[in-house]
């Protein structure tokens, strides 16, 4: 099992032809560094392919996922930003499900 303490999602689309070194460079451009035990997620422009780069403390893993139908529900934040997501949100995201509200506490702000 690969230990993952933090999961970071980038809003910048990535060319899925990129190999290990190009993906690592994209992570450094988007996040500033590659931390051990962190996963960095990127999606292509069409939204049906995802790359995940993980530093396990000893080396780098590069995983690719493609949806046969539909698209990933990617973050709707400003271009160039990134955000942290939870493991539960990641599970929904990789299945192509809406994940943005998973794990949020339902807080009443007005009566």
Feature map (PLM): residue ranges:
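Polybasic/polar functional segments that serve as interface/processing modules
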Residues: 1-111
